[in-house]
């Protein structure tokens, strides 16, 4: 029963931690499947049209040259259809193989061989670090770590490198790359009710006004804002008011609209939509796992001002992690455990807690080990007491 519960807990842990490992390649496979379907349907319709034209021509006793020309057109369309089909199938096959490779890797966690299990855990740690580095913008370091650990097929480097290109273009105050990304994911973004493309068009309008190209700005508004409604219509009305003010105006809200910091907001909006598109959280799995681990062992003793109760073996008590764990909740403990300050052993019926006259509690076995001439010295206050003065503590 205990083994089954442990296996179930491990399975649940994998589902939580490894969700991005399978979800991202699955979404890529799904996207390529839909793109292939559209391409093949489009090319098939082209073939159908030229075949229909050929049949219509043949019904009226045409000249040989015209028939040959139409046949060449049919052959050309069939060649294009074949090429598009082969390319689409190859792309789908690559995505399917990637999904299979990652599934096989996740199955290795249940290996009975200690060495194999240890290697799998090491790879999982490297995968978490690669994803965290990619999220933080350390792309070269992440790629080197993935290559060194042999986990390039197990991490989502391609997705983050694509995002890197988009973010860098926005940092250069260019919208073309991000708009192309929006076009590639148009159907999914529409289902998500994303406003990223609209925000980009608004920014393009603002830049035209900044450059004093007001006539171009009006044309841009007619082209892209004619279908705006609801809150978007209110935003359009606001930016249209910029036409009445100079680019260096200090009047709000037009001054805020002209603030270059809006480009940073667009980067954040793209990043948010990109994570939603691939159903990823805003924090890396490494961050979430670290926070969960710190919270599981965090106690009030880790934050005593005098530092007397801090343990050198406790990660939360360490200087590097103590501040990081500060906003996290304390560990949930249904049953308290008393740990001896001297030995670090749990105090229980085999090592009952004993209280000295000064109020400090230690394990019975520890007091026996430091007793000299029937006297014990309190490690904290250096006070000396007779061993018989220690009283047994009972916890209700």
From Swiss-Prot:
Region feature Extracellular and involved in cell to cell contact, mapped onto this chain: 1-124
RING-Gid-type zinc finger segments: 314-381
Catalytic reaction list: S-ubiquitinyl-[E2 ubiquitin-conjugating enzyme]-L-cysteine + [acceptor protein]-L-lysine = [E2 ubiquitin-conjugating enzyme]-L-cysteine + N(6)-ubiquitinyl-[acceptor protein]-L-lysine
The keyword Nucleotide-binding appears for this protein: no
GO cellular component: actin cytoskeleton; actomyosin contractile ring; cytoplasm; cytoskeleton; GID complex; nuclear matrix; nucleoplasm; nucleus
Organism annotation: Rattus norvegicus
Annotated protein name in UniProt: E3 ubiquitin-protein transferase MAEA
All copies of domain LisH, residue ranges: 121-153
Residue stretches making up the CTLH domain: 159-216
MF GO annotations: actin binding; ubiquitin protein ligase activity; zinc ion binding
Domain description: The expected RING-type zinc finger domain is highly divergent and most of the expected Cys residues are not conserved. Still, the protein is required for CTLH complex E3 ubiquitin-protein transferase activity. In addition, the conserved Cys-314 in this highly divergent region is required for ubiquitination by the yeast GID complex, suggesting a direct role in catalyzing ubiquitination.
Domain of life: Eukaryota
Modifications the protein undergoes after translation, according to the UniProt entry: Autoubiquitinated as component of the CTLH E3 ubiquitin-protein ligase complex (in vitro).
Site note Essential for ubiquitin ligase activity, residues: 314
Pfam families tied to this protein: CTLH
